[in-house]
A protein has these predicted regions:
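Flavin-dependent oxidoreductase catalytic cores
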Residues: 1-176, 180, 184-191, 196, ...
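Surface-exposed alpha-helical segments enriched in charged/polar residues
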Residues: 29, 68, 229-230, 251
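Short, structured secondary-structure boundary patches
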Residues: 59-63, 103, 216-223, 239-240, ...
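Phosphate- and divalent-cation-binding pockets in alpha/beta enzyme and binding domains
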Residues: 89, 208, 249
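Short alpha-helix boundary/capping motifs
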Residues: 98, 121-122, 217-218, 233, ...
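FAD-binding core/adjacent interface of flavoenzyme oxidoreductases
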Residues: 130-140, 166-167, 235-272
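Beta1-alpha1 glycine-rich phosphate/pyrophosphate-binding loop at the start
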Residues: 175-238, 242, 267-271
Length: 272
C-alpha cells in the first residue's frame, strides 16, 4: 500500500510532512525488486483519514492517477480501489490501463452481491455505497459493545445469518410513504411473498432524502433513492404516487397489514 501523504497533509494545512507520489513510485519499484507479487495502491494515513476512506463529497475515481503512476513503472500486477462505485467505472479503469485488479471495500458492504449481479447482467439492481461513512461510525461506536457495524443502504449487514420467512402467500400489505423506510419495507415484504403497495402523497419517491440531497456535494444520496425504487419494484412492489392514504383508500385494498412509514418528527433539543 502506498501513501501519497504529502498531498493529503497539505489539504489539512500541514504541508511537507508526508512523502510525495514520486517517492511512493520509487518504493514500489524497490518492493518489486524484493520479490512481492502485487501491489495495492492507496493514499493518506490515519491522521489524514478522509483521503483514504472518503466521505460523500469525493468523486469516484479521484485518485486513480496514483495507481496509473505506479502501473507505468512496475511489471507486477497493480490493485487499486479508487473509490469505484459502478461496474462501468471499474471496467473503464481496467481498459485504460490504470490498474490490473479492482479492489472493492465499502462497495461490498453496501451490496455483498455486487459481483454476482455484475456477472448476471443485473447492474441496475446494485445498491451503491453513498460514502456516508455510517459503517465506520457504527464500527467505532459498537466495537466496545461487541456488536456489528451498520450500513445506511444495507440493513442486512451483520445479520446475514437471519433469513426472513417467506410466508406472504400473496397477501396485500399497504405501506404509507415512499421514503427509505417504506421502500425498504416494500422490498423485504416482496421477497417474502407479500404483495406490497406503497402509497405516496408526492409525485416522487424519497421522503426526507429529498431534503438531504439538496446541499452541495450530496448528490450521491440520489443513488440511494434510485436503488431503493429499482429493487422494490423489481421484486414486485407497486408504488402509487399522488395518493393521499386516508382510511377509505387503505381499506379499499383490503390489506393484511398496514405500515406507516411517513417519516420521523423533528425534535428541538431543550438546550437551544
Amino acid at each position: 500500500m502506498l501513501f501519497r501523504s504529502d498531498e493529503c497533509y497539505s489539504m489539512i494545512g500541514k504541508p511537507e510532512i508526508g512523502y510525495k507520489l514520486e517517492d511512493g513510485v520509487r518504493m514500489a519499484k524497490v518492493l518489486e525488486k524484493e520479490g512481492i507479487d502485487a501491489i495495492d495502491v492507496s493514499c493518506a494515513g490515519y491522521d489524514t483519514y478522509n483521503y483514504w476512506l472518503e466521505p460523500t463529497s469525493f468523486e469516484p475515481g479521484w485518485r486513480k492517477y496514483m495507481a496509473a503512476a505506479v502501473k507505468k513503472e512496475v511489471k507486477i500486477p497493480v490493485l487499486a480501489a479508487n473509490l469505484i462505485r459502478s461496474p462501468k467505472q471499474a471496467e473503464e479503469q481496467l481498459e485504460e490501463g490504470i490498474q490490473d485488479f479492482v479492489s472493492l471495500g465499502r462497495t461490498h458492504i453496501a451490496d455483498p452481491h455486487w459481483v454476482n449481479k455484475v456477472k448476471a447482467g443485473k447492474e441496475d439492481e446494485i445498491k451503491r455505497c453513498i460514502c456516508c461513512l455510517y459503517c465506520m461510525e457504527s464500527m467505532q461506536k459498537n466495537a466496545y459493545k461487541g456488536t456489528h457495524a451498520h450500513c445506511s443502504v444495507n440493513p442486512k449487514l451483520g445479520k446475514e445469518s437471519e433469513h426472513p420467512i417467506a410466508n406472504g402467500n400473496g397477501r396485500t400489505v399497504v405501506i404509507v410513504g415512499a421514503g427509505p423506510a417504506g421502500l425498504m419495507s416494500a422490498e423485504v415484504l416482496a421477497k417474502r411473498g407479500f404483495k406490497p403497495i406503497v402509497l405516496e402523497k408526492n409525485a416522487f419517491p424519497g421522503g426526507q432524502l429529498q431534503l438531504a440531497n439538496k446541499p452541495p456535494l450530496k448528490e450521491k444520496i440520489n443513488w440511494c433513492i434510485e436503488d431503493l425504487v429499482t429493487n422494490a419494484t423489481h421484486y414486485g412492489a407497486e408504488i402509487k404516487y399522488n395518493v393521499i392514504a386516508d382510511e377509505s383508500i387503505i381499506k379499499s385494498y383490503n390489506p393484511y397489514a398496514v405500515i406507516i412509514a411517513t417519516g420521523g418528527k423533528a425534535i428541538k433539543p431543550k438546550s437551544i
